Amino acid sequence: IVSSKGVIDSYRKIHLYFKEKLWFSPGDKKIEVFEIDGAKIGIMICFDWIFPETARTLSILGADIIAHPSNLVLPYCQKAMVTRCLENRVFAITANRIGKEIRGEDNFNFTGASQITSYNGKILSSAPTNKPFVDFAEVDLKKSRDKKLNRFNNLIKDRRKEMYLS
């Protein structure tokens, strides 16, 4: 994790995908949120997205924005990030790889389509699936810090933790 002051910490991918389980160990650092220039940034890497607990934990810890660097090959993440942002009222930036890679007998087709998703599920920017793309979006951090869905419902405070399995 890098800020204007330099390297401040690191994050280790928690959930390994496919043959990564043969070569790597899952990350063993607790999920954290980092304050960078007034924004609270949470990180999840690639396949971490498929586990809703990752985004929920980042939201509970106060993340305004989830940074999500990825090498996605499954076609589901970009649509799922709409839900992750909506259910946690956070912004997310998925920076995904494009192109193809052959590793031995395995062929990987990366889905591209990097995107910036708003706290309300609106896609603020969507990249092409097959070419490099750089974009930015202005975000209002007050929106991600307000977990009220309406005047009666708060997405964090209304959780019934005693009813859930861990």
Write out the residue ranges for each language-model feature:
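A conserved C-terminal secondary-structure "cap"
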Residues: 144-166
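CN hydrolase (nitrilase-like) catalytic-core segments centered on the catalytic cysteine
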Residues: 50-134
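A periodicity- and composition-biased signal for non-globular, repetitive helical segments
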Residues: 19, 103, 165-166
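Short, intrinsically disordered low-complexity segments
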Residues: 12, 88, 96, 150, ...
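Active-site catalytic loop in hydrolytic enzyme cores
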Residues: 1-61, 70, 76-79, 83, ...
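Conserved catalytic-core subdomain
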Residues: 140
